[in-house]
Amino acid sequence: MKLSIDFKNKVREAILSDRENYGGSDADYAKRLNLKGAILSRLKKGEVEKLISDTQWLVIAHQLGVQVRDNAWKVARTVVYTEIEDNLLYCKEYSKSMILVDDCGIGKTFCSRHIVRKLKNAFYVDCSQAKTKQQFIRLLAKTIGVDNTGKYVDVKASIKMCLIYLEQPLIVLDEAGDLDYNAFLELKELWNATQGECAWYMMGADGLRAKIESGIAHKKVGYAEIFDRFFDITSIVPQGTDDRREFYIQLLGDVASVNAKQKEDVDKLVRKCMNPNDLNTKDVTPSDWKRLRYLENLIKLS
């Protein structure tokens, strides 16, 4: 697959935009993208040809949310988007820490990625891609622009220094339930070292909820301290069945209204998500409800 000049220029524009939201040096920013400083300098001057491999272009595009093909999926300001945005802005402003534990498929990842890209010194980490403490620390280092190839203790020390040096940094830890026990303990150390200087926002679904409950119930060393530091555990989806149903109808409707090809299809799409098997209404249970990924597939196939 040969990448077009237009695509490379889109990635270049994304790099320049992302650079504006990073408070470190050009050299540090280049490390985030696994680029040499000289290559970044040439990109800033407008060059795109014969600088890096097509694979590197694609890796950077993925990191910065640039699509190879425009899928035309629009962002809806749902209650999930607004709640996460409010949480992130609060944490960032006051260097606080929070945990969001909620249903899967409500747009937590999509919303947080979109919001983080707009904020200065805000960083998104997908913990499902770095489950052990070694993988996690080195991925975090790369994400914030720190050399992640040295000795483990040196990399960790550099992370602490960088997070203290940056202005109001925010770290979003998505899929945090995938982190193993030792990686969780590293979070306690990082939080202690950056208290009052860095905001942390942990997100997850059933896996994170189970890890929190099991760790505290079995009195695993460090767990109570970790979740005490992430002082507020929040959820967005209501608990009562009727309230949950109304929440999902609203969420699906909000997303469908800005993405459906025909506006008159919105109600039909929502009904299909809430009752995908065409059951009698009284036989439909919350476990039958489909969520945003299903809605996206319906819209793209329509």
Regions found by a protein language model. Name each.
Residues 97-104, 191-221:
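Sensor-1/coupling segment of RecA-like P-loop NTPase cores
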Residues 65-79:
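Short C-terminal boundary/hinge segments that cap the last helix of small helical domains
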Residues 93-114, 128-129:
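Walker A/P-loop nucleotide-binding motif
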Residues 132-138, 147-199, 221-222, 226-227, ...:
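Mid-core helix/loop region of P-loop NTP-binding domains shared across ATPases and GTPases
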Residues 1-66, 232-302:
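C-terminal alpha-helical "lid" subdomain
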Residues 119-129:
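Conserved catalytic segments around the Walker B and adjacent sensor/switch elements
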Residues 117, 142, 189:
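Short, well-ordered alpha-helices that flank and scaffold nucleotide-derived cofactor binding pockets
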Residues 75-93:
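Pre-Walker A adenine-sensing motif
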